[in-house]
Amino acid sequence: ITNVPFIWSDPQNRSPKSSDSLLSTIDIAPTILSRANVKPYWGIQGVDFLQSIERKTSFREDLMIEFHDNIVRFGFDKPAFVRSLISERYRFTLYKDQEFGELYDLENDPNETFNLYDNKNYSSVRSMLYKKLVNQMMENIDKSPAPKRLA
């Protein structure tokens, strides 16, 4: 279950606000740089989340979570290498080199107790989330600057 509050104290704006937007740790650096009026460096990932909070709009439909375990857990033969996609409605998780995964309908199962990954009724949802996860992985990959000249 991933539901972690993030508290931001802003000396430029002391009025309390809250948001249910999907935020990530990759959003912290762009937010700090924006607040300090510093141009972000080439290839920075994430977005300035204060704009979303001030406008009361969500800036992303889903969010990828990466996890690389450093120990072998029960049921695994090596440390887990995991990618999850969280949306308002679903959480979808894949484990590297494993046949199983996780799919939870957060609207009907907010405590994530009924894994729907192998449920045939959710196969189209699983396919859609798989594609979105791949797109998130491509979006968050490090990018090199484009060359200014070609030889």
Question: How should each PLM-predicted stretch be described?
Answer:
Residues 1:
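Membrane-interface catalytic loops of GT-C/OST-like multi-pass glycosylation enzymes that act
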Residues 4:
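Active-site neighborhoods of enzymes that stabilize oxyanions during catalysis
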Residues 15-22:
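A short glycine-threonine-serine/GTX helix/turn-capping micro-motif
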Residues 109:
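Intrinsically disordered, low-complexity polar regions and short flexible loop motifs
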